[in-house]
Design a protein with these regions (language model features):
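N-terminal secretory signal peptides that target proteins for export/translocation
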Residues: 1-6
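Bacterial N-terminal signal peptides
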Residues: 11-22
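HIT superfamily nucleotide-processing domains
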Residues: 27-271
Length: 271
């Protein structure tokens, strides 16, 4: 009797603790740090002096409203962040689904060259990935796309699942990196014409209404007949199962692939 009475209280306490974890972690950071760097330093320096520092790049050719900055992340030698130069809080921001929205994932894929420069050589397209975390998993209130190497085990799983991944969102046959994801493929050497934010909101039932709980990951891939494309992955945060929707967990900030990769890099214009 006593044990049965205690269990609900323990479960409730555990659930409350799980809900608090992201907010407690966020308090250790300034949630506006990225925005202050981009808006307060990188953009003004680029405009005034043609120098994006402390960012690696600032692109304003389409205006601040559609521009972006590339910033070296503090974690890992190869990780970079693609950050809009307009104020966009996160994956749930309606600006990302506006008719004239910039395709930040396409810009992030182009920014993979910074990762390769940090490594010192090119990687095959399936060795590079992009990720946006859910609201529960992030510590910054400015949209940022993680750009880095893909974990070796994640690469191996996607390689195995590649033929079964279709052109519409569907649950994958097995977990990726220890978590269940939905996946789809898009074809092309770049993401021009394919906006993952829009594909998620329009292609997964209910996603448009709870984008704050979603995480998005994009991994380069080669499909049948060596055709270039991408695998898109999405997951919905589930705190009861300790899944906060942290897609960046599929990336490897130590880039073991750069040390162990035996496959040749793709030809320079087709990656």
């Amino acid at each position: 009797m006593r044990a049965a009475a205690i269990r609900p209280s323990v479960a409730a306490f555990a659930f409350a603790a799980v809900l608090l974890l992201p907010s407690l972690a966020a308090r250790a950071y300034d949630p506006n740090a990225l925005w202050k760097i981009v808006n307060g330093e990188c953009v003004p320096n680029q405009v005034a002096h043609g120098d994006p520092k402390p960012c690696a790049e600032v692109d304003l050719k389409n205006g601040v409203e559609h521009g972006y900055a590339v910033l070296k992340d503090l974690h890992g030698p190869t990780q970079y962040l693609l950050i809009p130069t307009q104020r966009i809080v996160g994956i749930e921001s309606p600006e990302l689904l506006a008719p004239d929205a910039a395709n930040y994932f396409a810009d992030a894929w182009n920014a993979r060259t910074f990762v390769e420069k940090a490594i010192g050589r090119a990687l095959p397209r399936d060795g590079l990935g992009l990720a946006v975390n859910s609201k529960l998993a992030r510590t910054q209130n400015q949209l940022h796309i993680h750009v880095d190497c893909v974990r070796s085990d994640v690469r191996a799983t996607l390689d195995k699942l590649r033929a079964s991944i279709g052109y519409a969102w569907a649950p994958l046959a097995e977990p990726v990196g220890g978590y269940g994801y939905w996946g789809m493929r898009v074809m092309g050497g770049t993401l021009a014409g394919h906006d993952p934010f829009r594909l998620l909101a329009e292609g997964v039932a209910g996603a448009r209404d709870d984008m704050q709980l979603r995480t998005l990951v994009v991994v380069g891939m080669r499909f049948e007949n060596d055709a270039p494309g991408f695998v898109l992955l999405q997951d919905r945060a589930d705190v009861l199962h300790l899944d906060f929707g942290a897609g960046a967990r599929l990336l490897d900030h130590d880039c073991a692939l750069a040390k162990n990769n035996a496959r040749p890099a793709d030809a320079a214009g087709a990656r």
